[in-house]
Amino acid sequence: MGYEVRIWQKDETPAFDAFDEFEPDIFMGQSYHLDEALFKCIQHRPHMKVVLRGSDWGDIQKDIDLDKYPILVASKEEKKLLERLKEETGKPDFVHNHYHENWIKHTHNKWEDIGIKPFSLIHGADVFEFGLRPPVDVLKCDIGFVGGYWPYKAKCLDKYLIKLCHPVGDYNIKIFGNRNWPVVQYMGSIASENVGSLFASATVSPNISEPHSQDFGYDIIERPFKVLMSGGFCISDYVESMANDVFINNEIVFAKTPEEFKKLIDFYIKNPDERIKHMKAGYESVVENHTYFDRVASILTELNLPEEAAKCINVKMSLFGAEE
């Protein structure tokens, strides 16, 4: 597409050096990384468009126990510095987060109080890393899962996935990840280029969210997009926004309880052809609406760069056999 992109390793290169060396037209960062040095770099470049991933700051936080649910929320210092940045520079152009637009008005509405628009930018799929592929014999299994295991996430993993690991042998389960899982089905790490092959080879690729996603319903993780883009079949725990806002056409089968999750696993292992309609709907949905080409196009549209946004979509369409 003709863009030059530089990833700034902020802990290795000072802000002034990074910006002087590259002189970006668009800067994308995080609201919680704003400091005085970055402030000045933005201030000295009035032509530069600025997009920041914004921490949660909205009415919904008053109902959430942040000791129980470690959600990233905006700090007092972060709010003050962003308010000053907006007053003095008019930046950022907007903040975004990966919640659907039906929810971001509740999770991020306080940003509007300081003149900053919150923008929905849900996760998607990388079409170069994930895509249709044949099953791989050594990765074939009843249940295939890639992810980490730590105490907070274990609150859900234990009920949905770990429970199925016992007795050993009831299911052919392959678990990969960068942390040690407390089960013999854990097979260590997996190369990133093989993750999509696991999703394509497993009978079921489950999606299991963290406690706040299940309990509050708005945080949709990236895994289901990867599974569907790879042509895999996904059974997911129930996350309200994922079921009602994003995957609303039978792309994913949802289970509201661990018991229902197990029943669905058993049904689709015994009846694998019943997966096909969901796999087809899932792949088509992601290709049409949920690739990272679509997400970049959304950013460029919001920045009032419609011609650049159209280029993104045309590149996507050319990859899938058509062009707008």
Locations of regions flagged by a protein language model:
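C-terminal amphipathic helix plus adjacent low-complexity
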Residues: 262-324
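Nucleotide-sugar donor-binding catalytic core of glycosyltransferases
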Residues: 1-22, 30-40, 54-57, 63, ...
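Short beta-strand/loop segments at the ligand-binding rim of alpha/beta enzyme cores
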Residues: 46-51
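Short amphipathic alpha-helix used as the core "switch/output" element in two-component signaling
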Residues: 42-44
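Short, electropositive alpha-helical surface patch
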Residues: 24-25, 257, 291
